[in-house]
């Protein structure tokens, strides 16, 4: 299977990458079938050979996740929702909903406690007034 992946080159700690088409079993920095572009993560510079990339995708080449993101930014692929993103967002939404319910419950309990305390104070003041009028 042909993969579209990034091939690292450049100095230590100053990596740049070439977008290459290669066999999925070959090494990351091995000889590619074809060089399709360039990506520098420091400067965010990206150069893509759009015709060659479309040709490789038409032949069934599978891009890696990072390459897919670059191609989506370049307008060569439509943005797709990946299953892991869907699951993560669903978990986050469920957590937010549970937190909101918990906060609402705590607020209701605090309001009820405040109302009970106010009622107790009112009873205490009423009983104090009645004792003072009796005596």
Swiss-Prot record:
The keyword GTP-binding does not apply. Keywords: Ribonucleoprotein, Ribosomal protein. Residues 123-135 have a biased composition (Acidic residues). It comes from the Bacteria. Residues 94-121 have a biased composition (Basic and acidic residues). GO terms for cellular component: cytoplasm; small ribosomal subunit. The keyword Acetylation does not apply. InterPro entries: Ribosomal_bS16 (IPR000307), Ribosomal_bS16_CS (IPR020592), Ribosomal_bS16_dom_sf (IPR023803). Coiled coil: none annotated. One of its GO terms (biological process) is translation. One of its GO terms (molecular function) is structural constituent of ribosome. Pfam families: Ribosomal_S16. Residues 82-135 are annotated as: Disordered. Belongs to the bacterial ribosomal protein bS16 family. This is Small ribosomal subunit protein bS16. It comes from Synechococcus sp. (strain CC9605).
